[in-house]
Design a protein with these regions (language model features):
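Aromatic "clamp/platform" in nucleotide-sugar-dependent glycosyltransferases that forms part
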Residues: 301
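Nucleotide-activated donor-binding/catalytic signature segment of Leloir-type glycosyltransferases, i.e.
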Residues: 263-281
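A short, well-ordered alpha-helix in the C-terminal region of glycosyltransferases
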Residues: 354, 361-377, 383-389
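Conserved acidic donor-binding segment of nucleotide-sugar-dependent glycosyltransferases
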Residues: 333-334, 338-345, 354-360
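A conserved mid-protein helix/loop that constitutes part of the nucleotide-sugar donor-binding site
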Residues: 14-18, 217, 224-240, 260, ...
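Donor nucleotide-sugar binding/catalytic pocket of nucleotide-sugar-dependent glycosyltransferases
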Residues: 34, 138-141, 156-204
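Short hydrophobic beta-strand element within catalytic cores of glycosyltransferases
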Residues: 318-321
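Glycosyltransferase donor-sugar binding loop
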Residues: 222, 249-263, 279
Length: 395
């Protein structure tokens, strides 16, 4: 099978990268489309074919002309529609050639299936769903579904125009599937395949749980600085712990730098000695460090299913999460983790205090159940096979 993965960036997220490798190892021809953002030397070993959108002006023009000529020879019946549609949506000639590259590359690869990873791509490059002669799958993820169309009515209407043209949808949680249904994604076309972790993660597993009665509770959150991640409420909860004389250290591991409002809040609450912010750790380093923490908290307002939570559960790190998005699909309160209401720093502080007083036998039972949840339902091998079934499904 010739599989195209339209990710927009190469390399892409860890889950998608692992999916590419598994597809290739099963003998499928895999093409990945995007702008190169990092090293991809391992693609060659795995026979993964990167289709890179060039940045250089001359390269952009040359590639666009090459693609147009290829399609004039092999797909003459469609090229005029494609070029007209591309031209209508462009601001200038450079933008026209750039859009040609981003739209036409999948058309020359004779794909059996094109899997678009981000919902906004079907709006920005609608030709991919209107004219391509193969099955089109769209992944429904995070803010593209839960936030963007809610605050942007124009985007919501465009989703309603283009979602009905998609053959199948992949949702990372049932909650996102229900939300996407508001914009024209029919429920009978949606397959729910949760994010997953590679089974190699268990080599970092620490069977000896970190004791909670140590001098200082070591807490961690993982995720970029963005209002939807709820860090302001997490810091308010830390301020409550500080006021009550509870010893703790809270680390935020983020892919971007601290925002001004968070920095102001840190200073205003005088939390500088209690909080550490780490930027730019690779996922491998994050996984290595996770077992050193007593507790992971997810204070988000919206999530599909958090990869950081999956990794923590696999590594037997207890998790307190807000009951947002699809998190209650993985966490069962007091069974394999803990759920609290969103936007409630008092409840978060209370749950942390309950955790501190909890017996080690109870914590052991929680992390045992969390680890088993991952082994039963959230391993990458299972999800890759489910994804291939969507690709092969003739309906």
């Amino acid at each position: 099978m010739r599989i195209g993965i339209y990710s927009g960036e190469i390399p892409t997220s860890k889950f998608i990268e692992q999916m590419l490798q598994d597809f290739a190892s099963k003998g499928h021809e895999v093409y990945v489309y995007g702008t190169q953002k990092g090293e991809i030397n391992y693609y060659k070993k795995l026979s993964i074919k990167p289709r890179i959108f060039p940045k250089n002006k001359l390269a952009i023009i040359l590639l666009a002309n090459f693609l147009i000529i290829r399609l004039l020879i092999n797909r003459r019946y469609i090229i005029s529609k494609l070029l007209t549609s591309i031209f209508i949506s462009t601001k200038n000639w450079k933008h026209f050639f750039s859009r040609c590259n981003r739209v036409l590359l999948p058309f020359v690869d004779n794909l059996d299936v094109l899997h678009i990873q981000w919902a906004k791509s079907v709006v920005n490059y609608s030709e991919l769903v209107k004219y391509i002669n193969c099955k089109v799958i769209l992944s429904l993820r995070g803010t593209h579904i839960n936030v963007s169309p809610v605050v942007d009515n124009r985007l919501a209407n465009l989703y309603r125009t283009y979602f009905p043209l998609v053959d199948k949808f992949h949702a990372v949680s049932y909650s996102i599937a229900k939300e996407a249904n508001k914009y024209g994604a029919e429920m009978n076309k949606i397959s729910i395949i949760n994010p997953a972790v590679n089974k190699t993660i268990f080599k970092h597993n620490n069977k000896n749980i970190k004791k909670t009665n140590t001098k200082s509770l070591n807490i961690v959150s993982i995720g970029r600085f963005h209002w939807i991640k709820g860090y302001t409420y997490a810091l308010d909860a830390m301020s409550i712990l500080k006021t009550e004389g509870i010893h703790f250290h809270y680390t935020i591991i983020s892919s971007n730098f601290v925002s001004e409002n968070i920095q102001y809040q840190l200073n205003d609450l005088d939390l500088g000695n209690y909080i550490e912010i780490i930027n730019g750790l690779s996922n491998e380093k994050v996984i290595e460090q996770l077992p050193n923490y007593n507790l992971l908290i997810l204070p988000s307002f919206e999530e599909g299913i958090s990869n950081a939570v999956l990794e923590a559960m696999a590594l037997r790190v207890p998790v307190i999460s807000t009951n947002c998005g699809g998190m209650n699909e993985i966490i069962k309160h007091n069974e394999n983790g803990f759920l609290i209401p969103i936007r409630n720093s008092i409840k978060l502080a209370e749950e942390i205090k309950k955790f501190i007083k909890m017996s080690e036998s109870k914590i052991l039972k929680i992390v045992d159940a969390a680890e088993q949840t991952i082994k039963d339902n959230y391993l990458l091998d299972h999800q890759v096979n489910k994804m291939l079934q969507i690709y092969k499904d003739p309906n």
